[in-house]
């Protein structure tokens, strides 16, 4: 809410304070306080199944209902449960990619996955405080749009070498491949100049996440990082925009690869920006897991150890929505170790692949979905983070209409 505050466990000091004051405990202390009756969650040290019964407050879901409070539920415990991803630490089945299954989440089951519920709660809470203390003022952050891109496969045909192109042609004969390789037409995944023009036109500051696996595999199929084409592509973007690491699928199986891939990317950024290695290594490095493949707490513990400072993986790789029920950056709290870390988590709510492959939406349906996320984020002055892949925004016939819908959406963001 953008306000300064002081924490105290001194009940007499609390009573004597003459300004706005919030009592978070199991009993009231002062007549002029704003009282929130606490749930036990924040005072527990073990991780266990919680009894959660949702109800409706101001047309939105809530839980950890209170009886004698000035607020209808324990907003602190409920927010912590969602933002810490408490439920992901409990025993659960995983999906086909080894990830937490979104359908097991409270947000999915209770129908609020499409809302930044914590941001909404905070706004309601601030209004309640204002009712009790008219002098209480909040300073909300401003709405922010942050476009991000995952470069899993930089080019469809170019720079893949003779053997890969022959193999690809034998599997799927295509005149387009021949035209691209002879320079007659542009590679269908090459949308970089168009994106650059779009960013300049609307004054956007995107982040590009590059997959730089040292070798290809079933799920890692990018141009190899030692090739000039990949170096040049990353260098071009690092000179203009923020560049992050897209840790490979292989790095999820071989724990030693994450650090190596980060070092590879840092070397490329260093070459682009002409800065000493020690400075390049100290610059904050954002990351987003390939296929959104990570589990808590191990996945984030590995990022911390590898020196990844900002993670952009907090969302689902199977459905759009707010995985942590929030649209604001937060520090990751390691529930297993019970400590706040320095890892910044930047939650996203939309990924093109979810709309296309999982939700089976067409461009018009996807535009409406995006406009919904734009609206709900603007209403609470939150940050809207989207994920797009370059193959969706080029000229591949499979994705006809998706480039145009993205441009329409960007225009709507700026209105």
Enumerate the language-model features and the residues they cover.
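Terminal accessory/targeting
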Residues: 1-225, 328, 335, 339-415
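Glycine-centered flexibility motif
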Residues: 2, 111, 240-244, 319-323, ...
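Conserved hydrophobic/aromatic pocket- or pore-lining residues that grip, position, or stack substrates
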Residues: 150, 246, 303
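Metal-dependent polysaccharide deacetylase catalytic core of the NodB/CE4 family, i.e.
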Residues: 153-157, 193, 200-294, 390
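Acidic, His- and aromatic-enriched active-site or binding-groove loops in soluble protein domains
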Residues: 167-176, 226-246, 307-315
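Residues within well-ordered alpha-helices
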Residues: 195, 230-233, 299, 373
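Active-site proximal loops enriched in glycine and acidic residues that flank catalytic Cys/His/Asp
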Residues: 210, 247, 288-291, 307-316, ...
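Catalytic domains of cell-wall/extracellular-matrix polysaccharide-remodeling enzymes
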Residues: 251-339, 397-398
């Amino acid at each position: 809410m953008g306000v300064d505050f002081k924490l105290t466990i001194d009940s007499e000091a609390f009573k004597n304070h003459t300004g706005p004051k919030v009592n978070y405990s199991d009993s009231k202390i002062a007549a002029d306080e704003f009282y929130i009756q606490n749930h036990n969650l924040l005072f527990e040290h073990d991780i266990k199944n919680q009894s959660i019964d949702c109800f409706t407050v101001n047309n939105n879901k809530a839980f950890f209902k209170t009886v004698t409070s000035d607020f209808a539920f324990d907003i602190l415990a409920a927010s912590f449960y969602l933002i810490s991803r408490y439920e992901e630490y409990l025993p659960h089945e995983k999906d086909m990619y080894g990830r937490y299954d979104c359908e097991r989440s409270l947000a999915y089951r209770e129908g609020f996955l499409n809302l930044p519920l914590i941001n909404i709660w905070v706004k309601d809470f601030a209004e309640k405080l204002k009712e009790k203390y008219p002098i209480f003022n909040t300073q909300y952050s401003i709405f922010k749009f942050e476009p991000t891109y995952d470069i899993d496969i930089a080019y469809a045909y170019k720079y893949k070498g003779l053997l890969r192109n022959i193999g690809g042609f034998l599997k799927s004969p295509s005149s387009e491949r021949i035209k691209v390789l002879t320079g007659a037409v542009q590679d269908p995944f090459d949308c970089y100049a168009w994106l650059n023009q779009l960013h300049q036109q609307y004054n956007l500051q995107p982040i590009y996440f590059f997959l730089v696996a040292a070798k290809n595999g079933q799920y890692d199929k990018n141009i190899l990082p030692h090739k000039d084409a990949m170096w040049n592509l990353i260098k071009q973007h690092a000179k203009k925009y923020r560049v992050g690491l897209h840790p490979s699928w292989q790095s999820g199986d071989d724990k030693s690869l994450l650090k190596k891939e980060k070092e590879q990317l840092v070397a490329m950024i260093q070459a682009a920006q002409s800065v000493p290695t020690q400075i390049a290594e100290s610059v904050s490095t954002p990351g987003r897991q390939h296929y959104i493949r990570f589990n808590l707490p191990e996945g984030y513990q590995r990022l911390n150890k590898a020196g990844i400072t900002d993670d952009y993986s907090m969302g689902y790789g199977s459905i759009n929505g707010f995985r942590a029920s929030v649209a604001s950056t937060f520090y990751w709290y390691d529930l297993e170790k019970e400590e706040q870390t320095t890892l910044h988590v930047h939650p996203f709510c939309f990924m093109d692949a979810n709309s296309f492959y999982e939700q089976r939406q067409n461009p018009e349906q996807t535009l409406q979905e995006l406009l919904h996320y734009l609206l709900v984020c603007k209403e609470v002055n939150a940050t809207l983070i989207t994920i797009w892949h370059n193959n969706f925004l080029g000229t591949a016939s499979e994705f006809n209409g998706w480039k145009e819908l993205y441009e329409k959406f960007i225009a709507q963001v700026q209105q």
